[in-house]
Amino acid sequence: MVSRSYSNLLDLASGNFHSFSREKKRFPRVATVTGVLSELDDDNNSNSVCSDAPSSVTQDRIIIVGNQLPIKSHRNSAGKLSFSWDNDSLLLQLKDGMREDMEVVYIGCLKEQIDTVEQDDVSQRLLENFKCVPAYIPPELFTKYYHGFCKQHLWPLFHYMLPLTPDLGGRFDRSLWQAYLSVNKIFADKVMEVISPDDDFVWVHDYHLMVLPTFLRKRFNRVKLGFFLHSPFPSSEIYRTLPVRNELLRALLNADLIGFHTFDYARHFLSCCSRMLGLSYQSKRGTIGLEYYGRTVSIKILPVGIHISQLQSILNLPETQTKVAELRDQFLDQKVLLGVDDMDIFKGISLKLLAMEQLLTQHPEKRGRVVLVQIANPARGRGKDVQEVQSETEATVKRINEMFGRPGYQPVVLIDTPLQFFERIAYYVIAECCLVTAVRDGMNLIPYEYIICRQGNPKLNETIGLDPSAAKKSMLVVSEFIGCSPSLSGAIRVNPWNIDAVTEAMDYALIVSEAEKQMRHEKHHKYVSTHDVAYWARSFIQDLERACGDHVRKRCWGIGFGLGFRVVALDPSFKKLSIEHIVSAYKRTKNRAILLDYDGTMVQPGSIRTTPTRETIEILNNLSSDPKNIVYLVSGKDRRTLTEWFSSCDDLGLGAEHGYFIRPNDGTDWETSSLVSGFEWKQIAEPVMRLYTETTDGSTIETKETALVWNYQFADPDFGSCQAKELMEHLESVLTNDPVSVKTGQQLVEVKPQGVNKGLVAERLLTTMQEKGKLLDFILCVGDDRSDEDMFEVIMSAKDGPALSPVAEIFACTVGQKPSKAKYYLDDTAEIIRMLDGLAATNTTISDQTDSTATVPTKDLF
């Protein structure tokens, strides 16, 4: 089964033309096509499809991709399979946040292994009845992928556990990584079988499928793709230990929107992108964006919620009320503390038990009156660590019960057998306090469920003997290290490693006044009830639509091989400068202006040697000696340095310190801009910069005649960036009344006079030539960073003005493929030099062909 656009492409290639009239979207009956993704691994095809075939879709559709389908399967005694929705699945619950007219398709694995002979039939049934597309993973491959790479490498690492010994996650296994890639490719196959790439949205969930965005982006450059990580994202110091760290980061950056539960998780991801990929981010109007090859990858911070109506419906069940009554009688005259956790090493069950033990030791009066009910769900992974946690938990429970128990009283009730959902709900209802002491967790929705259940309903109030009009109450003790903690402002937050603090929190939760319990509950209930799973899904989809809004107007193409693949997305008018084209224009024009940046344009960024090479000097001399040319080199460097470096270029004009100083091309003295009256502000700014230099290792101050620059190129990227933001705010504050601008650049903060920029040189050149009655018919302007954008803006805005010939050729060229006001680009400084050399060679050829007796035009001076 393939997408309609893909089928159309095959038909066109074979000459089988059909009518492409719009029709209602429909699914093929059976997903049976395999091997669709084979071209993704062919590096010869790395320049993937730039634009996808027009779709015949009329209805919005979103494809939800997760490790598991929200489907339950059951095989009866006759061996026949039946399927039903898994109402507990988050992927199913998020449908409540979708628009009514949005169709939802699911792709994922089934929990049960399906025989090969049954797969076609199962696929057809799931597609027709549930709009689900199953991904079938061979058992051995699934074991390596899920229990291997996901659970032995990613899961521990994302929860801050390093494989320091073979028992702690194990050493990195390349075969498990290959299995992870293979499974992600299978998922990509399934997506491509059903997607209409121009219209459909794709939402990928969790760490199991982190490389899927690359495979999808490689096939469809404009795919509308969101990714949400449901686990923590570790700090860069932890994440950087992963051998495939860059591959995973680059894969995620092929999404349009990346979602995290908390700011901490997003901050760690951004830090990793900065430290390992050299990417910077910007926050604008509350949205965080990473610029990545012309694409803006949006970062979304959005904690997930719960499905409230489902909980309320279960609260209304008769069996729930019966179970609540049973538990009320079981724990009569006792206060119940409740813990609900998976049986794994990160949930902190043993820490909770130790705190309970200490509570009963320090407060003998609570013996017989307080019970901890610990519900331990089966672990999702398997291994030695799970067995150790289970053994430790059972041993600790046994010790506490033997020490403090008595007939009719069991201090800790451990429930390690699966409970039905209504049974768990009943425990929420009767619990005085809910305890979550995980040492690291993604979101953890247990506190949210507890809050809604404590709100109750009239029937439950009657069952447990509460006045229906009485205010509801609840208490939460939560770990600082779980995703829901920042959202629960009324909870008692604890460091679970501090047993004393957890014990004190448990005691306080038991003795706090009824009024405070009610106040905390009301605050939590208001938040949880308004930030449910529907709100979460709706907000994510809205942001995804915004993030993909400019896809159609961008020109996209793929570069890079394998997992290094990425898409360059640029304005349609932005294209690579053809050297043949510019040389041709150069030859047929007579009044030419050439404006050149230096650092990053004439010399490679980060080079140890920054002085011009002999080749560069020769090229500049050849160009500037042509009487038809006016050539200016415009730099941020000071005039003394430029004078020294280009002393042999007699006909070269210079612009120093971003155009504040200009030396005309006749070799006369430097001229100074009249925009600035004084530099008294330096006495204020320099001490501030010096303070930040002393406290930021690796930073330096560059003092110019007209500007001060604080550079943190060699400082820690995160700390340097943080210090730069603070320094900028500090400088803006102390220099409010001074005529200066404080700007950030590439790892620098610069203070300079207002109105001084490289555009001044371009403006003066155009004005002077117009006054002389010589209209320019050729302009070349080349630069590589933000400071050069002012030159680009001036010459592009002069296109139809009086300073240029009506047939003027304008070439604004930046270095590298990136967003710019320039209309052309060349890949690097080597291509810039090659282009300039081509123009210089044209001068030599023309000179050789000119009659020696011909009159040489007088060179214009500026």
Curated annotation (Swiss-Prot):
Residues 60-546 are annotated as: Glycosyltransferase. Gene3D superfamilies: Glycogen Phosphorylase B, HAD superfamily/HAD-like, Trehalose-6-phosphate phosphatase related protein, domain 2. GO terms for molecular function: glycosyltransferase activity. The keyword Magnesium does not apply. Its EC number is 2.4.1.15. Keywords: Glycosyltransferase, Phosphoprotein, Transferase. Induction: 90-fold induction by sucrose after 24 hours and by heat stress. The modification Phosphothreonine is found at residue 32. It is an enzyme of class 2 (transferase). Low expression in leaves, stems, flower buds, flowers and siliques. It catalyses: D-glucose 6-phosphate + UDP-alpha-D-glucose = alpha,alpha-trehalose 6-phosphate + UDP + H(+). Both Ser-5 and Thr-32 must be phosphorylated for binding to GRF/14-3-3. It holds the Pfam family Trehalose_PPase. One of its GO terms (biological process) is trehalose biosynthetic process. The modification Phosphoserine is found at residue 5. SUPFAM superfamilies: HAD-like, UDP-Glycosyltransferase/glycogen phosphorylase. In the N-terminal section; belongs to the glycosyltransferase 20 family. In the C-terminal section; belongs to the trehalose phosphatase family. 2-deoxyglucose, but not phenformin, enhances the phosphorylation of TPS5. Binds to the phosphopeptide-binding site of GRF/14-3-3 and to MBF1c. This is Alpha,alpha-trehalose-phosphate synthase [UDP-forming] 5. It comes from Arabidopsis thaliana. The gene is TPS5.
